[in-house]
Amino acid sequence: MELKEFAIKILEMFECNEPKEFPRKVKEALFSATPSKYLDGYVNICDDLSVDHLQRIYQFYNADRAEKKQDYTPPSLAKLVAYLSYSAGQKVVYDCCAGSGALTIQKWVTDNNLTFVCEELDEQVIPILLFNLSVRNIEAIVLRKNILSQEIYEVYELHKGERYSKIQQVLYESPVAPDVAISNPPFSLKYAVKKNDIRYLEIVPPASNTNFAFVLNALSLCDKAVFILPTGVLTSKNEKGCRQKLLEKGWLKTVITLPGRMFESTSVTTCILVFDKQKRSKDVMIVDASNISTPIIREQRGEGDASHFYRVYKKEFNALSDVQIASIIELTEKESHNVSMLVPYEKAAEHDFNLSPGLYKELEFNENIIHRGYNEIVEDINRVIRERNVIKLTVNKVWANTLNLTEIAKMNKESNEIVRQINKALKQLGLKCEILNNKYINISTDKELRIENTDKEILSSLLLIFMPMYRQHVYFLNNEENRLLAELRDAMLPDLLSGKLTFEDTNN
């Protein structure tokens, strides 16, 4: 069922006049005299309980990317985490930053008898989490909690019933020792941990982000944990100390880099880190799964008046098939040439504890390949950039969100940073050729949109038809540019290996 159509049915069932009422109405339904009316209604609309369907509705209407860094876990990624976190005899699972429960649901699919401890700070998403647990008849404790400061605001207990879990709000948490932790925490929040916090006495995460703060919190509760994190945790300078200490202790078992474009609301690339405090060696298995994926198309109706509501737009993402999930699991157990590498602690130390897979692959350089000259490649790149720059779009920030252009603007900025680095490298080689900057989009704070909108208060409906074509044109040219940049990269490789070229380290 298409998202908008599904959302309308769910919102009508909860008697929501507008989407922002959704969390409140769900909570009212759960604590009403007849919660089974709504639970039955949900099952009638969607009888597949193996997927967190409510997640997509909440994310579309209510998720907070800017402040809380909320991006909810794709189902196939949650399924991979469920299998990676398996061990015999598990009874209790801790879901750190549980969100709407996507990870918990996939873990529950593997074993319906598991008990869950779910911690989540966002008051708005707690009702969605409770509904997801109850409709699946899951035994759980749910805490609305600031995991970093350890402040607890609300506690709920869910006990299995005949068909649905019964929910009860309680005053105090009943401590339960988890066997494993699973988590997709908010990425790179800023938070300075307290000096006397026993979770961080041996390993102190940086104040600039909380990625490893969440990890260390989980490892203070149980010996095994599986985390989805941004790939920056593998290379950033300010998190080097955490990587080093975790490797010294032998707690980091596996690193898996994932394909891009798996999340709906962010282009940040991600990885999975598997921890095991019972592991006896300091070696770490590094798996490059960035090229293992299956493209999927998600359909969604347009926003705005009827002419756009009845138009279905398509967006492509990457997902993992069951076969690909099984392949990744297998790669974590054995080495495969340049895909999964068992890296000794000493080798990681040689690379300053940078855990990017590329550092540990064997270089394969074919001297028989003859590349075109730099000038010729750069000329082709500039041809693509010039064509893309012919139309410059200046658009108000609010309208950019409405038209799904914020990702395009981010790509423009990221591309210019790559161009800056390559131009610096070309100068090192004594070449005069230079790649042009991208100038095809500008996000403005003024109420303006140029290609050109005459009314500054009203957004022309024509643009809602035009923009999907514009985005596809940019994506096409981005792919063409990436192909040529890859050719330029390969041409530079001999000069890079010989030391004639150096690139600055831009990691924080």
Predicted regions and their residues:
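Soluble or luminal CAZymes and related metallo-dependent hydrolases
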Residues: 2, 6, 121, 210
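A generic structural signal for residues located within well-ordered alpha-helices
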Residues: 73, 210, 266-268, 480, ...
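A conserved structural/catalytic subdomain of Rossmann-like adenosyl-cofactor enzymes
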Residues: 157-159, 179-408, 462
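Amphipathic alpha-helical coiled-coil/heptad-repeat segments
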Residues: 344, 366-432, 436, 444-508
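Conserved S-adenosyl-L-methionine
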Residues: 75-183, 188-192, 230-231, 248
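Alpha-helix N-cap/helix-initiation motif
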Residues: 70, 118, 203-207, 474
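Class I S-adenosyl-L-methionine
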Residues: 1-111
